[in-house]
């Protein structure tokens, strides 16, 4: 297992606040989370998410985890990656490999890394 790649772990609190705001304001996703918690449709599964990493998509990753999945996350665009949200996901126990402004070679490495987490 690879260590998380997080540019600013000290910003996790700010990221958690953003994700909590999203949670409060997305009732449909909250309902899905509730159902996933009960039904555990992804128990024992590994899910990789490669997406614009910001508060709404971070909440989606957490919803997937609430369904029992082991979730690994990377950003799909270094310019849309929000570092405090990345730090929050790591703090919440997800495997995260992303940072704002990453170079193309880094992005490739992050995408390979999230793929490797599912091969072991």
Residue ranges and their predicted role:
Residues 2-36, 41:
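Positively charged, low-complexity intrinsically disordered leader regions
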Residues 43-45:
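Phosphate-coordination loops involved in phosphoryl transfer and adenosine-cofactor binding
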Residues 54-67:
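Histidine-anchored nucleotide/phosphate-binding helix
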Residues 70-79:
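Short internal beta-strands
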Residues 82-93:
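Active-site-proximal loop->helix
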């Amino acid at each position: 297992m690879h260590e998380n790649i997080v540019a600013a772990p000290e910003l996790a609190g700010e990221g958690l606040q953003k994700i909590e705001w999203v949670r409060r304001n997305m009732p449909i996703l909250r309902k899905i989370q509730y159902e996933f918690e009960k039904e555990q449709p992804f128990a024992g599964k590994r899910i990789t998410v490669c997406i614009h990493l910001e508060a709404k998509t971070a909440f989606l990753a957490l919803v997937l985890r609430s369904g029992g999945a082991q979730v690994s996350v990377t950003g799909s665009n270094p310019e849309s990656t929000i570092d405090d949200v990345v730090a929050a996901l790591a703090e919440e126990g997800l495997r995260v490999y992303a940072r704002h402004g990453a170079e193309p070679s880094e992005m490739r490495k992050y995408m390979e890394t999230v793929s490797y987490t599912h091969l072991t």
